[in-house]
């Protein structure tokens, strides 16, 4: 992987990630394909929304179908027939989500398989081996996602263990002679001094990119923004920055305002299945009765297959009847909305008018523009 930074506009960055499998224009949003599929979508349909890179889930693909089945096909790209790059998370967040079902120790995490209850073990080394077999274009280190709220002592111990796991991840990645990219994950909760230690330690180890982890786990938006403003300037400018598990359209805009290049989230696909659709001026709940006889298109500014062919009334009908097609059409639209938003962001940076775009975006959705700490160092 090669990262090229073309230009900056304030803190916002415009660039691209170059892989053997293709080019990803940044800032970029990655649809989530947890089990080797973006729910309800073929790879061709996902590509048609404008997506250039997908996210797969190491933890879930390890449990089902498993490494051996994957290797029978070649790798995850061959298994799911996605031709572009794939980033896989390490399994750390899924382990964190298991709660009382898991025991975190220095060597790794012991837990019970949520599918069949058997005892299994996941370590930094094992995560690197699984992701190697998946053929991931971007591999994420194995870390502990520090929960919120956590006191300073817990966050410190968690961050320090994640740093030790980062070294072990790097070592095993290199032993496997993996030629793809490896990203470090910055932890430390909402504590700036701990984030400082994490960034410094990861940069000393050396990675191809750096993710900001442990955010969007329940903390106030002000804390997320504060941590991003504090951490971003410390990440090497020639490396991509990835905000994990984020988020709403506003979160993408605010992340870019603070120097983030990459995002992923289940929100556009999950919300689509629940009838919550993103449009130019906000969100539409398509199952609401007011859409029952609405013959207008979902979003007149959208060029997706759904908007070009179907009315709000039809989408309302499908949703009320729990028809699978409704979930598919909604997903096509929401993913296209996210990709159009990222394209608008990239164009605004190209034209040196990103902050004007930010104000236009918030005016469209009827929300105030969050403050930006202008005293923070620029991320360029």
From Swiss-Prot:
Free-text cofactor note: Binds 1 zinc ion per subunit.
A Pfam family: TGT
Binding site for Zn(2+): 302, 304, 307, 333
Enzyme Commission numbers on file: 2.4.2.29
Superkingdom field: Bacteria
SUPFAM superfamilies reported in the protein's UniProt record: tRNA-guanine transglycosylase
Cofactor(s) listed in the protein's UniProt record: Zn(2+)
Catalytic activities: 7-aminomethyl-7-carbaguanine + guanosine(34) in tRNA = 7-aminomethyl-7-carbaguanosine(34) in tRNA + guanine
Key words, A-Z: Glycosyltransferase, Metal-binding, Queuosine biosynthesis, Transferase, tRNA processing, Zinc
Protein residues bound to substrate: 89-93, 143, 187, 214
This protein's pathway: tRNA modification; tRNA-queuosine biosynthesis
Region (RNA binding): 245-251, 269-273
UniProt GO cellular component terms: cytosol
Active site residues according to the UniProt entry: 89 (proton acceptor), 264 (nucleophile)
Molecular function GO labels: metal ion binding; tRNA-guanosine(34) queuine transglycosylase activity
Database matches in InterPro entries: ArchSynthase1/Queuine_TRR (IPR050076), TGT (IPR004803), TGT-like_sf (IPR036511), tRNA_ribo_trans-like (IPR002616)
GO biological process: queuosine biosynthetic process; tRNA wobble guanine modification; tRNA-guanine transglycosylation
Matches recorded under HAMAP family: Q_tRNA_Tgt (MF_00168)
Family indicated by similarity: Belongs to the queuine tRNA-ribosyltransferase family.
Role summary: Catalyzes the base-exchange of a guanine (G) residue with the queuine precursor 7-aminomethyl-7-deazaguanine (PreQ1) at position 34 (anticodon wobble position) in tRNAs with GU(N) anticodons (tRNA-Asp, -Asn, -His and -Tyr). Catalysis occurs through a double-displacement mechanism. The nucleophile active site attacks the C1' of nucleotide 34 to detach the guanine base from the RNA, forming a covalent enzyme-RNA intermediate. The proton acceptor active site deprotonates the incoming PreQ1, allowing a nucleophilic attack on the C1' of the ribose to form the product.
Subunit structure of this chain's protein: Homodimer. Within each dimer, one monomer is responsible for RNA recognition and catalysis, while the other monomer binds to the replacement base PreQ1.
Name by which UniProt lists this protein: Queuine tRNA-ribosyltransferase
Organism: Proteus mirabilis (strain HI4320)
Gene: tgt
């Amino acid at each position: 992987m090669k990262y090229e930074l073309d230009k900056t506009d304030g803190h916002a960055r415009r660039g691209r990630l170059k892989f053997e499998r293709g080019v990803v224009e940044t800032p970029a949003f990655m649809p989530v394909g947890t089990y080797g599929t973006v729910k309800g979508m073929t790879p061709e349909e996902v590509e048609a929304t404008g997506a250039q890179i997908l996210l797969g889930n190491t933890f879930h693909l390890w449990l089902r179908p498993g490494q051996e089945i994957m290797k029978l096909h070649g790798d995850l790209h061959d298994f799911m027939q996605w031709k572009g790059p794939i980033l896989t998370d390490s399994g750390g967040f899924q382990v964190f989500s298991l709660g009382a079902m898991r025991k975190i120790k220095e060597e790794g995490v012991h837990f019970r398989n949520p599918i069949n209850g058997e005892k299994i073990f996941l370590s930094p080394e094992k995560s690197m081996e699984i992701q190697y077999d998946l053929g991931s274009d971007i591999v994420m280190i194995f870390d502990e996602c520090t929960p919120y709220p956590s006191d300073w002592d817990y966050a410190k111990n968690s961050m320090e263990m994640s740093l030790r796991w980062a070294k072990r991840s790097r070592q095993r990645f290199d032993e496997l002679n993996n030629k793809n990219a490896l990203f470090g994950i910055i932890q430390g909760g909402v504590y700036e001094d701990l984030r400082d230690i994490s960034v410094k330690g990861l940069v000393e180890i050396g990675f191809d990119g750096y993710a900001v982890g442990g955010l969007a786990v329940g903390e106030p938006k002000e804390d997320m923004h504060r941590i991003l403003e504090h951490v971003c300037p410390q990440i090497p400018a020639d490396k991509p920055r990835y905000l994990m598990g984020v988020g709403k359209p506003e979160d993408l805009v605010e992340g870019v305002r603070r120097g983030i290049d990459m995002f992923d989230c289940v929100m556009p696909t999950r919300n689509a299945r629940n009838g919550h659709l993103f449009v130019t001026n906000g969100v539409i709940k398509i199952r609401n009765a007011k859409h029952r006889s609405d013959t207008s298109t979902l979003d007149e500014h959208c060029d997706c297959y759904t908007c070009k062919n179907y009315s709000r009334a039809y989408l309302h009908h499908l949703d009320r009847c729990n028809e699978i097609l409704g979930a598919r059409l909604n997903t096509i639209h929401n993913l296209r909305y996210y990709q159009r938003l990222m394209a608008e962001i990239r164009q605004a940076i190209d034209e040196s008018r990103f902050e004007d775009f930010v104000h236009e975006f918030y005016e469209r959705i009827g929300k105030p523009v969050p403050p930006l700490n202008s005293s923070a160092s620029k991320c360029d």
